[in-house]
Amino acid sequence: MGPEAKFYNYFKKNTPNISYTRIENTSSLGTPDVLAYNKNNVFFTIEFKVTKSKKVRFSPHQIAFHVKHPINTFICIKTPDACGLRLYEGSRIRELVACGLELEACCLGLAACRLKLE
């Protein structure tokens, strides 16, 4: 199991009020990792990333997806710094590509991310 799959499993285990459907899609490149559904009856997608540096790698297809679908899309990044976890809105993907982890996240840490998404 790769680092992003491990991160997804950790996140899923620690957000029990969210229903997740893992998307394994080889025909539509750039589709986020999961389709999620919260207790407020809201669907959203999450792209999970793990980085050991301040840069986050995205494929051109992932960037295009978030540019085309800026609402209810999120990018959740496991980082090596003290906060450990950052959540960004998909609408900010171009800034995230350009600035990396210097870009201010909408949430820092698991508890804040859980509150935002639940």
Please tell me what each predicted stretch does:
Residues 1-25, 39:
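Acidic-basic catalytic patches of nuclease active cores, encompassing PD-(D/E)XK
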Residues 52-69:
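Mg2+/Mn2+-dependent nuclease catalytic core
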Residues 98-99, 103-115:
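Long, intrinsically disordered low-complexity tandem-repeat segments
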Residues 34-36, 42-52:
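Conserved catalytic cores of phosphodiester-cleaving nucleases, focusing on short active-site segments
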Residues 30:
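Beta-rich catalytic cores
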Residues 94-96:
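Class I S-adenosyl-L-methionine-dependent methyltransferase catalytic core
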Residues 39-40, 51, 77-82:
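Short, flexible beta-strand-to-coil junctions
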